[in-house]
Swiss-Prot record:
<dbReference type="GO" id="GO:0005737">
    <property type="term" value="C:cytoplasm"/>
</dbReference>
<dbReference type="InterPro" id="IPR001585">
    <property type="entry name" value="TAL/FSA"/>
</dbReference>
<dbReference type="Pfam" id="PF00923">
    <property type="entry name" value="TAL_FSA"/>
</dbReference>
<dbReference type="GO" id="GO:0016832">
    <property type="term" value="F:aldehyde-lyase activity"/>
</dbReference>
<dbReference type="GO" id="GO:0005975">
    <property type="term" value="P:carbohydrate metabolic process"/>
</dbReference>
<dbReference type="GO" id="GO:0006098">
    <property type="term" value="P:pentose-phosphate shunt"/>
</dbReference>
<comment type="pathway">
    <text>Carbohydrate degradation; pentose phosphate pathway; D-glyceraldehyde 3-phosphate and beta-D-fructose 6-phosphate from D-ribose 5-phosphate and D-xylulose 5-phosphate (non-oxidative stage): step 2/3.</text>
</comment>
<keyword id="KW-0808">Transferase</keyword>
<dbReference type="InterPro" id="IPR022999">
    <property type="entry name" value="Transaldolase_3B"/>
</dbReference>
<dbReference type="InterPro" id="IPR018225">
    <property type="entry name" value="Transaldolase_AS"/>
</dbReference>
<comment type="function">
    <text>Transaldolase is important for the balance of metabolites in the pentose-phosphate pathway.</text>
</comment>
<keyword id="KW-0963">Cytoplasm</keyword>
<dbReference type="GO" id="GO:0004801">
    <property type="term" value="F:transaldolase activity"/>
</dbReference>
<dbReference type="InterPro" id="IPR004731">
    <property type="entry name" value="Transaldolase_3B/F6P_aldolase"/>
</dbReference>
<keyword id="KW-0570">Pentose shunt</keyword>
<feature type="active site" description="Schiff-base intermediate with substrate">
    <location>
        <position position="84"/>
    </location>
</feature>
<comment type="similarity">
    <text>Belongs to the transaldolase family. Type 3B subfamily.</text>
</comment>
Length: 212
């Protein structure tokens, strides 16, 4: 499973990139809205200067025709921009049109296996099932990853699964076990993955022994 960082904060992206494990970035309107110091397009240019992998940039339009035009504008910013489209009927139309133009797409706000299957059939490069938000309403978001992976494998679909709305390290472990191709998460979760109390204790013991 590859690691994406879910943020529009350039400092966080650079820090994640320095770890040597960053394969891409996902953003959304909520994350971009937190970045008051720069325009959306300028921030995307900054991000694509740092990251060579996929950078998902979400449209804010809701009508298919407007999504398509906005998607073309976003894709023109850099060759590694992936246009992020919400899972709606208009979104599916936009995905098909953008795919036909050779533009990569990431269908977001996936909460059912049927939604993921529709997005894949429309030509989506990626689908993003949301784990944490399903957990919040008493459903098991990780089961959705398993369902989508099985369906894609059975039908030979190339669309990749991005496990999104990752809240903690256990989400990462389980998403990887269940076959997600990518996990996108905040920098704080990536940092949590590096930690274990026995690792810290081992380092302390090594240093104590060395300094005797």
């Amino acid at each position: 499973m590859l690691f994406f960082v879910d943020t529009a904060n350039i400092a966080d992206i650079k820090e994640a990139h320095e770890l040597g494990i960053l394969a891409g970035v996902t953003t959304n309107p909520s994350l971009v809205a937190k970045e008051k110091d720069v325009s959306f397009h300028d921030r995307l240019r900054e991000i694509t200067d740092v990251v060579s992998g996929s950078v998902s940039a979400e449209v804010i339009s809701l009508k298919a025709e407007e999504m398509i035009e906005e998607g073309k504008e976003l894709a023109a910013i850099a060759p590694n921009i992936t246009v992020k489209i919400p899972m709606t009927t208009d979104g599916l139309k936009a995905v098909k049109a953008l795919t036909d133009l050779g533009i990569k797409t990431n269908v977001t706000l996936i909460f059912s296996a049927n939604q993921a299957l529709l997005a894949a059939r429309a030509g989506a490069t990626y689908v993003s099932p949301f784990l944490g938000r399903l957990d919040d309403i008493g459903q098991n978001g990780l089961d959705l990853i398993s369902e989508v992976k099985t369906i894609f494998d059975v039908h030979g679909l190339d669309t990749q699964i991005i496990a999104a709305s990752i809240r903690h390290p256990q989400h990462v472990t389980e998403a990887a076990l269940r076959g997600a191709h990518i996990g996108t998460m905040p920098l704080k979760v990536i940092k949590q993955l590096t930690k274990h109390p026995l690792t810290d204790a081992g380092i302390e013991q090594f240093l104590a022994d060395w300094n005797k």
